[in-house]
């Protein structure tokens, strides 16, 4: 899907660590989130219409490309995320967006999830809808990945409690975007929200930062058995959730 969108100079924003092997039908059935959900939303928000085959063989043709369609009941959201229990999705109308023309990527050290939440609010206030990705990583994730995945290292070169990999972008050429990000991060560092930072200076450095994030599952497998989970929590509740969940895991 992403390649087809790129061929017509458009952008399909659903991006997953498993995007090299997953299929759009599975993404729809699980309502996958992805790395760009902070700006574009989860899979449900990227769909205009569906074609679905029910268990008795009937076909529901809802392949509309309209944002507003009052010709009947909108059953789309019943099937997205239902994991095939209500019917098999056989086709979909998907939303495409203008391709990002200017992208800035930063890898940041923060004290904890509370600081990360504060940083997200600041970046959103400074850039509007410019925050495309915002990934929180505990220290152990960076350590495991650097230890078990060839070609991956700690971008900051020294240990910190937690990290954020963030990206801001615009659909136009905007040479001022980097300065805006730098100014926001400088103020965050002055206020003690950000402890250290590195900004990608090239496409290769950007790819290296994202390789670290996307290689975390591979590092977990190499380190031994792990329990996979996918939990949705309101942003404001993340600090409390992390504190209670971490205590429960360590108990």
Question: Model-flagged regions — what are they?
Answer:
Residues 1-251:
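Noncatalytic alpha-helical scaffold of FAD-dependent oxidoreductases
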């Amino acid at each position: 899907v992403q390649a087809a969108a790129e061929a017509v100079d458009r952008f399909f924003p659903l991006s997953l660590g498993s995007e090299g092997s997953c299929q759009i039908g599975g993404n729809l059935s699980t309502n996958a989130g992805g790395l760009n959900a902070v700006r574009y939303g989860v899979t449900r928000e990227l769909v205009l219409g569906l074609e679905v085959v029910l268990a008795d063989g009937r076909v529901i043709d809802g392949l509309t490309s309209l944002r507003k369609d009052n010709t009947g009941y909108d059953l789309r959201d019943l099937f997205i995320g239902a994991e095939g229990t209500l019917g098999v999705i056989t086709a979909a109308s998907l939303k495409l967006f203008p391709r990002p023309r200017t992208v800035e990527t930063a890898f940041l050290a923060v004290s904890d999830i509370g600081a990360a939440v504060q940083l997200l609010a600041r970046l959103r206030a400074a850039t509007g809808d410019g925050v495309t990705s915002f990934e929180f990583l505990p220290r152990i994730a960076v350590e495991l990945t650097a230890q078990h995945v060839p070609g991956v290292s700690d971008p900051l070169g020294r240990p910190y409690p937690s990290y954020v990999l963030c990206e801001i972008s615009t659909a136009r050429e905007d040479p001022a975007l980097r300065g805006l990000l730098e100014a926001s991060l400088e103020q965050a560092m002055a206020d003690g929200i950000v402890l250290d930072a590195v900004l990608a200076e090239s496409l290769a450095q950007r790819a290296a930062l994202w390789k670290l994030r996307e290689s975390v599952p591979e590092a977990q497998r190499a380190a031994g058995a792990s329990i996979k989970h996918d939990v949705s929590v309101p942003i404001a509740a993340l600090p409390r959730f992390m504190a209670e969940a971490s205590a429960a895991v360590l108990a």
